[in-house]
Amino acid sequence: GAATANTTASTPDYRTLNFQSGIAEDTLLYGSIRQADWSNHQVAVAPQTQAAPTSDFSDSTTYTIGIGRKISDEWSVTASYKTEEASDNTGTSLLTPTDGYKAIGAAAIYTLENGTEITVGINYSMLGDKTVTDGGISGVFDDNTTVTSGIKVAYNF
């Protein structure tokens, strides 16, 4: 017969503090501090569930600061910087190949008269280095970056 296994996973507990303040006409400064408690939220795949979890996510704190500007009734732009401190955890799971990050992002928002918003954004992230050792096999993840982009269409009523 086929082998079967049970997998358990859950999302961490989060605490987030958001702020925003107008700093000039049509200009907004915003930011957040987000803490994630991973201590009881690891991924576990049987038969490892009896020995140790499959993942080794670390508690984390993420800081974001950004500025938004309304250019006209139709156009707005925003830019942000985000950082998550490294945990210095060497790692025992290939599910966690990074340790902290720094990222910059930008977006443009076009608002139609009917309330539809079209947002186009891009984000560049510099991922924290990490060495992972799992069952005698090591993986070194150094100098990795990501570029992500997206388009969102929303209707506000």
What is each stretch, according to the model?
Residues 1-157:
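Outer-membrane beta-barrel porins/channels
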